[in-house]
Protein backbone atom coordinates (compact mmCIF):
# COMPACT_ATOMS: atom_id res chain seq x y z
CA UNK A 1 0.00 0.00 0.00
CA UNK A 2 1.16 3.51 -0.78
CA UNK A 3 0.81 6.91 0.84
CA UNK A 4 -2.59 7.57 -0.77
CA UNK A 5 -3.76 4.24 -2.19
CA UNK A 6 -4.84 1.50 0.21
CA UNK A 7 -6.01 -1.99 -0.72
CA UNK A 8 -9.13 -0.53 -2.36
CA UNK A 9 -8.25 2.88 -3.77
CA UNK A 10 -7.98 6.18 -1.89
CA UNK A 11 -10.14 6.38 1.26
CA UNK A 12 -10.75 8.93 3.99
CA UNK A 13 -13.22 11.18 5.77
CA UNK A 14 -14.79 13.28 3.01
CA UNK A 15 -13.83 16.97 3.06
CA UNK A 16 -11.26 16.35 5.81
CA UNK A 17 -8.84 13.72 4.52
CA UNK A 18 -10.37 13.14 1.09
CA UNK A 19 -10.83 16.80 0.13
CA UNK A 20 -12.10 18.25 -3.17
CA UNK A 21 -8.59 19.60 -3.72
CA UNK A 22 -7.14 16.08 -3.45
CA UNK A 23 -9.94 14.68 -5.61
CA UNK A 24 -9.11 17.24 -8.33
CA UNK A 25 -5.47 16.12 -8.29
CA UNK A 26 -6.43 12.43 -8.29
CA UNK A 27 -8.66 13.07 -11.30
CA UNK A 28 -5.97 15.04 -13.10
CA UNK A 29 -3.01 12.76 -12.37
CA UNK A 30 -4.94 9.49 -12.39
CA UNK A 31 -6.60 10.40 -15.65
CA UNK A 32 -3.23 11.29 -17.16
CA UNK A 33 -1.52 8.04 -16.11
CA UNK A 34 -4.36 5.88 -17.47
CA UNK A 35 -5.03 7.79 -20.70
CA UNK A 36 -1.71 9.42 -21.71
CA UNK A 37 -1.34 7.18 -24.77
CA UNK A 38 -4.79 8.09 -26.15
CA UNK A 39 -6.00 11.18 -27.99
CA UNK A 40 -9.34 12.44 -26.54
CA UNK A 41 -9.63 9.60 -24.00
CA UNK A 42 -12.99 8.63 -22.52
CA UNK A 43 -13.36 8.22 -18.73
CA UNK A 44 -16.58 7.11 -16.99
CA UNK A 45 -17.50 8.02 -13.39
CA UNK A 46 -20.01 6.41 -11.02
CA UNK A 47 -20.81 7.04 -7.37
CA UNK A 48 -22.80 5.60 -4.49
CA UNK A 49 -25.46 7.51 -2.53
CA UNK A 50 -23.26 9.37 0.00
CA UNK A 51 -23.89 13.08 0.47
CA UNK A 52 -20.22 13.77 -0.36
CA UNK A 53 -20.45 12.00 -3.71
CA UNK A 54 -21.52 15.10 -5.65
CA UNK A 55 -18.71 17.21 -4.17
CA UNK A 56 -16.01 14.68 -5.00
CA UNK A 57 -17.50 13.92 -8.42
CA UNK A 58 -17.38 17.61 -9.36
CA UNK A 59 -13.72 17.87 -8.34
CA UNK A 60 -12.76 14.64 -10.10
CA UNK A 61 -14.54 15.70 -13.28
CA UNK A 62 -12.71 19.04 -13.27
CA UNK A 63 -9.36 17.30 -12.88
CA UNK A 64 -10.08 14.90 -15.72
CA UNK A 65 -11.37 17.62 -18.05
CA UNK A 66 -8.19 19.63 -17.43
CA UNK A 67 -6.17 16.85 -19.09
CA UNK A 68 -8.39 16.85 -22.18
CA UNK A 69 -10.34 13.72 -21.24
CA UNK A 70 -13.99 13.28 -22.26
CA UNK A 71 -15.95 12.43 -19.09
CA UNK A 72 -19.17 10.42 -18.96
CA UNK A 73 -21.11 10.54 -15.67
CA UNK A 74 -23.10 7.41 -14.83
CA UNK A 75 -24.78 8.77 -11.69
CA UNK A 76 -25.54 6.33 -8.86
CA UNK A 77 -24.37 2.85 -9.84
CA UNK A 78 -22.60 -0.12 -8.23
CA UNK A 79 -18.83 -0.59 -8.32
CA UNK A 80 -19.07 -3.71 -10.54
CA UNK A 81 -21.37 -1.71 -12.82
CA UNK A 82 -18.53 0.77 -13.38
CA UNK A 83 -16.02 -2.06 -13.92
CA UNK A 84 -18.27 -3.68 -16.55
CA UNK A 85 -19.14 -0.44 -18.35
CA UNK A 86 -15.51 0.72 -18.53
CA UNK A 87 -14.81 -2.18 -20.87
CA UNK A 88 -18.25 -2.36 -22.51
CA UNK A 89 -18.20 1.34 -23.47
CA UNK A 90 -14.56 1.21 -24.66
CA UNK A 91 -13.50 3.77 -22.05
CA UNK A 92 -9.82 4.21 -21.26
CA UNK A 93 -10.60 4.35 -17.53
CA UNK A 94 -13.44 4.09 -15.02
CA UNK A 95 -13.73 5.76 -11.62
CA UNK A 96 -15.98 4.81 -8.69
CA UNK A 97 -16.63 7.20 -5.82
CA UNK A 98 -17.52 5.09 -2.78
CA UNK A 99 -16.27 3.87 0.59
CA UNK A 100 -18.09 0.55 0.19
CA UNK A 101 -19.43 -0.70 3.57
CA UNK A 102 -17.92 2.21 5.57
CA UNK A 103 -20.07 4.83 7.35
CA UNK A 104 -21.44 7.90 5.56
CA UNK A 105 -18.69 10.33 6.60
CA UNK A 106 -16.11 8.28 4.69
CA UNK A 107 -15.69 8.21 0.95
CA UNK A 108 -13.21 6.83 -1.52
CA UNK A 109 -12.00 6.91 -5.11
CA UNK A 110 -10.99 3.82 -7.04
CA UNK A 111 -9.93 3.48 -10.65
CA UNK A 112 -10.42 0.76 -13.23
CA UNK A 113 -8.23 0.35 -16.30
CA UNK A 114 -9.61 -0.08 -19.83
CA UNK A 115 -9.81 -3.85 -19.21
CA UNK A 116 -12.20 -3.35 -16.26
CA UNK A 117 -9.67 -4.47 -13.65
CA UNK A 118 -8.49 -2.43 -10.66
CA UNK A 119 -5.13 -0.72 -11.04
CA UNK A 120 -1.79 -2.46 -10.65
CA UNK A 121 0.64 -1.45 -7.90
CA UNK A 122 2.83 0.11 -10.60
CA UNK A 123 0.02 2.33 -11.91
CA UNK A 124 -0.87 3.45 -8.39
CA UNK A 125 2.79 4.24 -7.68
CA UNK A 126 2.96 6.36 -10.84
CA UNK A 127 -0.11 8.36 -9.74
CA UNK A 128 1.30 8.76 -6.21
CA UNK A 129 4.60 10.08 -7.60
CA UNK A 130 2.71 12.81 -9.48
CA UNK A 131 0.62 13.64 -6.39
CA UNK A 132 3.80 14.17 -4.37
CA UNK A 133 5.52 16.43 -6.92
CA UNK A 134 5.83 20.04 -5.82
CA UNK A 135 5.09 21.37 -9.31
CA UNK A 136 2.37 20.13 -11.68
CA UNK A 137 4.14 19.80 -15.03
CA UNK A 138 1.40 17.95 -16.92
CA UNK A 139 0.11 19.41 -20.19
CA UNK A 140 -2.72 21.95 -19.89
CA UNK A 141 -4.80 21.89 -23.08
CA UNK A 142 -6.80 25.01 -23.95
CA UNK A 143 -9.73 25.98 -26.17
CA UNK A 144 -11.23 23.12 -28.14
CA UNK A 145 -8.65 20.69 -26.71
CA UNK A 146 -10.27 20.76 -23.27
CA UNK A 147 -12.44 17.80 -22.32
CA UNK A 148 -16.24 17.84 -22.20
CA UNK A 149 -18.68 16.15 -19.84
CA UNK A 150 -21.82 14.16 -20.70
CA UNK A 151 -24.30 11.98 -18.79
CA UNK A 152 -25.14 8.33 -19.41
CA UNK A 153 -27.59 7.47 -16.67
CA UNK A 154 -28.83 4.48 -18.73
CA UNK A 155 -25.56 2.71 -17.90
CA UNK A 156 -27.09 0.95 -14.90
CA UNK A 157 -29.74 -0.68 -17.09
CA UNK A 158 -27.13 -1.77 -19.64
CA UNK A 159 -25.20 -3.47 -16.83
CA UNK A 160 -28.36 -5.16 -15.44
CA UNK A 161 -29.25 -6.56 -18.86
CA UNK A 162 -25.75 -8.02 -19.09
CA UNK A 163 -25.78 -9.81 -15.71
CA UNK A 164 -29.40 -10.94 -16.16
CA UNK A 165 -28.39 -13.13 -19.09
CA UNK A 166 -26.06 -15.19 -16.84
CA UNK A 167 -28.97 -17.16 -15.33
CA UNK A 168 -30.67 -20.12 -16.96
CA UNK A 169 -34.32 -19.34 -16.22
CA UNK A 170 -36.52 -16.78 -14.48
CA UNK A 171 -37.20 -16.73 -10.74
CA UNK A 172 -40.98 -17.06 -10.84
CA UNK A 173 -42.37 -18.85 -7.80
CA UNK A 174 -39.66 -17.51 -5.48
CA UNK A 175 -40.09 -14.84 -2.82
CA UNK A 176 -36.85 -12.86 -2.45
CA UNK A 177 -36.14 -10.32 0.31
CA UNK A 178 -33.62 -7.60 -0.58
CA UNK A 179 -31.57 -5.26 1.62
CA UNK A 180 -29.82 -2.62 -0.47
CA UNK A 181 -28.10 -0.74 2.40
CA UNK A 182 -29.61 2.55 1.16
CA UNK A 183 -26.73 2.37 -1.31
CA UNK A 184 -25.86 1.95 -4.96
CA UNK A 185 -28.12 -1.07 -5.55
CA UNK A 186 -31.25 0.64 -4.14
CA UNK A 187 -32.84 1.25 -7.55
CA UNK A 188 -31.03 -1.57 -9.38
CA UNK A 189 -31.58 -4.79 -7.38
CA UNK A 190 -35.38 -4.47 -6.95
CA UNK A 191 -35.75 -3.85 -10.69
CA UNK A 192 -33.47 -6.79 -11.55
CA UNK A 193 -35.25 -9.40 -9.44
CA UNK A 194 -38.74 -8.12 -10.29
CA UNK A 195 -37.77 -8.28 -13.97
CA UNK A 196 -36.89 -11.95 -13.42
CA UNK A 197 -40.47 -12.44 -12.12
CA UNK A 198 -39.62 -13.04 -8.46
CA UNK A 199 -41.91 -11.77 -5.72
CA UNK A 200 -39.82 -9.27 -3.77
CA UNK A 201 -39.82 -7.60 -0.37
CA UNK A 202 -37.36 -4.77 0.14
CA UNK A 203 -35.59 -2.77 2.83
CA UNK A 204 -32.70 -0.31 2.69
CA UNK A 205 -33.97 1.14 -0.59
CA UNK A 206 -34.59 4.77 0.46
CA UNK A 207 -31.22 6.56 0.25
CA UNK A 208 -31.17 10.17 1.45
CA UNK A 209 -27.44 10.80 1.28
CA UNK A 210 -27.01 10.22 5.01
CA UNK A 211 -28.25 6.68 5.71
CA UNK A 212 -25.98 4.45 3.60
CA UNK A 213 -24.99 1.29 5.55
CA UNK A 214 -26.68 2.69 8.69
CA UNK A 215 -27.89 -0.44 10.50
CA UNK A 216 -28.62 -2.14 7.17
CA UNK A 217 -26.86 -4.03 4.39
CA UNK A 218 -24.31 -6.83 4.30
CA UNK A 219 -22.73 -5.80 7.62
CA UNK A 220 -26.10 -6.09 9.42
CA UNK A 221 -27.73 -9.22 7.92
CA UNK A 222 -29.61 -9.96 11.15
CA UNK A 223 -32.06 -7.18 10.21
CA UNK A 224 -32.78 -8.83 6.86
CA UNK A 225 -33.18 -12.18 8.66
CA UNK A 226 -36.18 -10.73 10.52
CA UNK A 227 -37.74 -9.58 7.23
CA UNK A 228 -37.20 -13.03 5.68
CA UNK A 229 -39.02 -14.70 8.59
CA UNK A 230 -41.78 -12.08 8.67
CA UNK A 231 -42.52 -12.37 4.93
CA UNK A 232 -41.87 -16.11 4.61
CA UNK A 233 -39.27 -15.43 1.91
CA UNK A 234 -37.27 -18.20 0.24
CA UNK A 235 -34.02 -16.23 0.49
CA UNK A 236 -32.69 -12.88 1.69
CA UNK A 237 -29.96 -10.99 -0.18
CA UNK A 238 -28.01 -8.20 1.56
CA UNK A 239 -25.68 -5.91 -0.39
CA UNK A 240 -23.24 -3.28 0.85
CA UNK A 241 -23.10 0.42 -0.02
CA UNK A 242 -21.39 0.03 -3.39
CA UNK A 243 -22.85 -3.36 -4.32
CA UNK A 244 -19.66 -5.42 -4.50
CA UNK A 245 -20.57 -7.71 -1.55
CA UNK A 246 -23.32 -10.21 -0.85
CA UNK A 247 -24.37 -11.85 2.41
CA UNK A 248 -27.44 -14.11 2.18
CA UNK A 249 -30.10 -15.35 4.59
CA UNK A 250 -31.76 -18.75 4.20
CA UNK A 251 -35.51 -19.39 4.44
CA UNK A 252 -35.18 -20.14 8.18
CA UNK A 253 -33.46 -16.83 8.95
CA UNK A 254 -29.92 -18.24 9.20
CA UNK A 255 -27.11 -16.04 7.86
CA UNK A 256 -25.15 -17.47 4.91
CA UNK A 257 -21.75 -15.79 4.59
CA UNK A 258 -19.25 -15.46 1.76
CA UNK A 259 -17.52 -18.77 2.54
CA UNK A 260 -20.82 -20.65 2.30
CA UNK A 261 -21.81 -18.82 -0.90
CA UNK A 262 -18.42 -19.66 -2.45
CA UNK A 263 -18.79 -23.30 -1.45
CA UNK A 264 -22.31 -23.54 -2.95
CA UNK A 265 -21.09 -21.95 -6.20
CA UNK A 266 -17.94 -24.11 -6.32
CA UNK A 267 -19.86 -27.37 -5.84
CA UNK A 268 -22.43 -26.48 -8.50
CA UNK A 269 -19.79 -25.22 -10.94
CA UNK A 270 -17.78 -28.43 -10.49
CA UNK A 271 -20.86 -30.60 -11.04
CA UNK A 272 -21.71 -28.68 -14.23
CA UNK A 273 -18.14 -28.62 -15.56
CA UNK A 274 -17.64 -24.88 -15.13
CA UNK A 275 -15.03 -24.70 -12.33
CA UNK A 276 -11.67 -23.99 -13.94
CA UNK A 277 -8.77 -26.12 -12.66
CA UNK A 278 -11.21 -27.46 -10.05
CA UNK A 279 -9.99 -24.68 -7.73
CA UNK A 280 -11.42 -21.84 -5.60
CA UNK A 281 -9.30 -18.88 -4.45
CA UNK A 282 -10.00 -17.57 -0.93
CA UNK A 283 -8.18 -15.65 1.80
CA UNK A 284 -6.56 -16.86 5.01
CA UNK A 285 -9.68 -15.68 6.90
CA UNK A 286 -11.97 -18.28 5.31
CA UNK A 287 -13.42 -20.73 7.83
CA UNK A 288 -11.76 -24.13 8.29
CA UNK A 289 -15.15 -25.70 7.59
CA UNK A 290 -15.02 -24.15 4.11
CA UNK A 291 -11.78 -25.95 3.29
CA UNK A 292 -13.00 -29.24 4.75
CA UNK A 293 -16.22 -29.02 2.69
CA UNK A 294 -14.25 -28.32 -0.49
CA UNK A 295 -11.93 -31.25 0.24
CA UNK A 296 -14.88 -33.58 0.84
CA UNK A 297 -16.19 -32.64 -2.61
CA UNK A 298 -12.86 -33.06 -4.39
CA UNK A 299 -12.26 -29.33 -4.87
CA UNK A 300 -8.89 -27.70 -4.22
CA UNK A 301 -8.31 -24.25 -2.74
CA UNK A 302 -5.71 -21.52 -3.07
CA UNK A 303 -5.18 -19.05 -0.19
CA UNK A 304 -4.16 -15.39 -0.40
CA UNK A 305 -3.70 -12.46 1.98
CA UNK A 306 -6.87 -10.62 3.07
CA UNK A 307 -8.26 -8.32 0.37
CA UNK A 308 -10.21 -8.96 -2.83
CA UNK A 309 -7.40 -7.46 -4.92
CA UNK A 310 -5.09 -10.30 -3.78
CA UNK A 311 -7.77 -12.87 -4.57
CA UNK A 312 -8.12 -11.36 -8.04
CA UNK A 313 -4.35 -11.33 -8.64
CA UNK A 314 -4.15 -15.04 -7.79
CA UNK A 315 -7.17 -15.83 -9.97
CA UNK A 316 -5.56 -14.11 -12.95
CA UNK A 317 -2.21 -15.78 -12.28
CA UNK A 318 -3.65 -19.29 -12.06
CA UNK A 319 -6.43 -18.97 -14.63
CA UNK A 320 -9.15 -19.56 -12.01
CA UNK A 321 -12.75 -18.35 -12.35
CA UNK A 322 -14.13 -18.42 -8.78
CA UNK A 323 -12.79 -16.70 -5.69
CA UNK A 324 -13.78 -14.46 -2.83
CA UNK A 325 -13.84 -13.58 0.84
CA UNK A 326 -15.87 -14.53 3.90
CA UNK A 327 -17.07 -10.90 3.99
CA UNK A 328 -19.08 -11.47 0.81
CA UNK A 329 -16.81 -10.35 -2.02
CA UNK A 330 -17.45 -13.10 -4.58
CA UNK A 331 -15.54 -12.88 -7.87
CA UNK A 332 -17.00 -14.73 -10.87
CA UNK A 333 -14.30 -14.00 -13.41
CA UNK A 334 -16.12 -15.60 -16.34
CA UNK A 335 -18.55 -12.68 -16.21
CA UNK A 336 -16.99 -9.66 -14.49
CA UNK A 337 -13.65 -8.28 -13.32
CA UNK A 338 -14.40 -7.52 -9.66
CA UNK A 339 -16.52 -8.69 -6.73
CA UNK A 340 -20.21 -8.29 -7.61
CA UNK A 341 -23.04 -8.63 -5.10
CA UNK A 342 -25.94 -8.70 -7.56
CA UNK A 343 -24.21 -11.13 -9.95
CA UNK A 344 -23.39 -13.43 -7.01
CA UNK A 345 -27.01 -13.19 -5.87
CA UNK A 346 -28.24 -14.17 -9.33
CA UNK A 347 -25.97 -17.22 -9.36
CA UNK A 348 -27.03 -18.27 -5.86
CA UNK A 349 -30.75 -18.06 -6.67
CA UNK A 350 -30.12 -19.78 -10.01
CA UNK A 351 -28.47 -22.71 -8.18
CA UNK A 352 -31.52 -22.97 -5.90
CA UNK A 353 -33.76 -23.11 -8.99
CA UNK A 354 -31.64 -25.60 -10.92
CA UNK A 355 -31.05 -27.98 -7.97
CA UNK A 356 -34.57 -27.53 -6.57
CA UNK A 357 -33.02 -27.26 -3.10
CA UNK A 358 -33.69 -24.61 -0.43
CA UNK A 359 -30.76 -22.44 0.61
CA UNK A 360 -30.64 -24.04 4.08
CA UNK A 361 -29.93 -27.43 2.47
CA UNK A 362 -27.30 -26.06 0.08
CA UNK A 363 -25.50 -24.15 2.86
CA UNK A 364 -25.91 -27.06 5.29
CA UNK A 365 -23.45 -29.14 3.27
CA UNK A 366 -20.70 -26.99 4.81
CA UNK A 367 -20.25 -27.11 8.59
CA UNK A 368 -18.68 -23.92 9.94
CA UNK A 369 -16.14 -24.31 12.73
CA UNK A 370 -16.70 -22.03 15.75
CA UNK A 371 -14.47 -18.99 15.38
CA UNK A 372 -13.19 -16.21 17.63
CA UNK A 373 -11.26 -13.12 16.57
CA UNK A 374 -9.68 -10.80 19.17
CA UNK A 375 -7.83 -7.58 18.32
CA UNK A 376 -4.92 -6.67 20.60
CA UNK A 377 -3.56 -3.10 20.55
CA UNK A 378 0.25 -3.29 20.48
CA UNK A 379 3.23 -0.96 20.62
CA UNK A 380 4.88 -2.45 17.53
CA UNK A 381 3.30 -4.89 15.06
CA UNK A 382 6.66 -5.98 13.63
CA UNK A 383 8.11 -6.74 17.06
CA UNK A 384 5.03 -8.78 17.93
CA UNK A 385 5.51 -11.10 14.97
CA UNK A 386 9.22 -11.56 15.79
CA UNK A 387 8.74 -12.11 19.54
CA UNK A 388 9.99 -15.55 20.61
CA UNK A 389 7.45 -16.07 23.43
CA UNK A 390 4.57 -15.25 21.08
CA UNK A 391 5.93 -17.63 18.44
CA UNK A 392 6.31 -20.33 21.10
CA UNK A 393 2.71 -20.11 22.39
CA UNK A 394 1.41 -20.25 18.80
CA UNK A 395 3.51 -23.39 18.19
CA UNK A 396 2.27 -25.02 21.42
CA UNK A 397 -1.40 -24.31 20.62
CA UNK A 398 -1.03 -25.59 17.04
CA UNK A 399 0.50 -28.82 18.37
CA UNK A 400 -2.42 -29.26 20.78
CA UNK A 401 -4.91 -28.74 17.96
CA UNK A 402 -3.34 -31.61 16.04
CA UNK A 403 -4.99 -30.53 12.77
CA UNK A 404 -8.46 -30.25 14.30
CA UNK A 405 -8.61 -26.46 14.17
CA UNK A 406 -6.32 -23.60 13.25
CA UNK A 407 -4.70 -20.43 14.59
CA UNK A 408 -4.07 -17.25 12.63
CA UNK A 409 -2.09 -14.37 14.13
CA UNK A 410 -1.59 -11.41 11.81
CA UNK A 411 -1.15 -7.63 11.94
CA UNK A 412 -3.89 -5.20 10.92
CA UNK A 413 -3.13 -3.46 7.64
CA UNK A 414 -4.28 -0.05 8.89
CA UNK A 415 -4.09 0.05 12.71
CA UNK A 416 -1.55 -0.81 15.49
CA UNK A 417 -3.33 -4.10 16.16
CA UNK A 418 -2.49 -7.79 16.16
CA UNK A 419 -5.45 -9.96 15.20
CA UNK A 420 -5.63 -13.34 16.94
CA UNK A 421 -8.10 -15.75 15.37
CA UNK A 422 -8.81 -19.40 16.14
CA UNK A 423 -11.20 -22.05 14.86
CA UNK A 424 -11.91 -25.28 16.73
CA UNK A 425 -14.61 -27.99 16.98
CA UNK A 426 -16.32 -26.21 19.91
CA UNK A 427 -16.63 -22.55 20.90
CA UNK A 428 -15.27 -23.31 24.39
CA UNK A 429 -12.04 -24.81 23.02
CA UNK A 430 -11.74 -22.02 20.46
CA UNK A 431 -12.09 -19.29 23.09
CA UNK A 432 -9.51 -20.96 25.35
CA UNK A 433 -6.91 -21.14 22.58
CA UNK A 434 -7.38 -17.48 21.62
CA UNK A 435 -7.20 -16.18 25.18
CA UNK A 436 -3.97 -18.08 25.88
CA UNK A 437 -2.29 -16.40 22.91
CA UNK A 438 -3.84 -12.98 23.63
CA UNK A 439 -2.45 -13.00 27.19
CA UNK A 440 1.09 -13.57 25.91
CA UNK A 441 0.76 -10.89 23.19
CA UNK A 442 -0.48 -8.38 25.79
CA UNK A 443 2.29 -9.26 28.23
CA UNK A 444 5.04 -8.96 25.62
CA UNK A 445 4.04 -6.04 23.35
CA UNK A 446 0.63 -4.82 24.52
CA UNK A 447 -0.06 -1.09 24.46
CA UNK A 448 -1.59 0.53 27.54
Curated annotation (Swiss-Prot):
GO biological process: one example: peptidoglycan biosynthetic process
Catalytic activity reported: alpha-D-glucosamine 1-phosphate = D-glucosamine 6-phosphate
Family listed: Belongs to the phosphohexose mutase family.
The record's account of how the chain is modified after translation: Activated by phosphorylation.
GO cellular component term of the entry, any: cytosol
Highest taxon of source: Bacteria
Lineage: Bacteria, Bacillati, Bacillota, Bacilli, Bacillales
Main function: Catalyzes the conversion of glucosamine-6-phosphate to glucosamine-1-phosphate.
Keyword presence, Transcription regulation: no
UniProt xrefs under InterPro entries: A-D-PHexomutase_a/b/a-I (IPR005844), A-D-PHexomutase_a/b/a-I/II/III (IPR016055), A-D-PHexomutase_a/b/a-II (IPR005845), A-D-PHexomutase_a/b/a-III (IPR005846), A-D-PHexomutase_C (IPR005843), A-D-PHexomutase_C_sf (IPR036900), A-D-PHexomutase_CS (IPR016066), Alpha-D-phosphohexomutase_SF (IPR005841)
Ligand binding (Mg(2+)): 100, 240, 242, 244
Cystine bridges: none
Protein name according to UniProt: Phosphoglucosamine mutase
The gene coding this protein: glmM
PROSITE patterns: PGM_PMM
EC number(s) stated in the UniProt entry for this protein: 5.4.2.10
Amino acid sequence: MGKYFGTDGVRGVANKELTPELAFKIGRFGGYVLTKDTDRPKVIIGRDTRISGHMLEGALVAGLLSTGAEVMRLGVISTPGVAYLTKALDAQAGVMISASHNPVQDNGIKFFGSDGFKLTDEQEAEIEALLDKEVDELPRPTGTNLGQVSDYFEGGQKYLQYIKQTVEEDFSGLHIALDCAHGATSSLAPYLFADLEADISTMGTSPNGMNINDGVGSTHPEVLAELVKEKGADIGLAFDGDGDRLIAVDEKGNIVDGDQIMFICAKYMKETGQLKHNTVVSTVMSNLGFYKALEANGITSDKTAVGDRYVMEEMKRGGYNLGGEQSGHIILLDYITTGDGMLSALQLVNIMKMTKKPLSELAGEMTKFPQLLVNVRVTDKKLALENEKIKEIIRVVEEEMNGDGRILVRPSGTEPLIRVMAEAPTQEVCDAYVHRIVEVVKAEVGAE
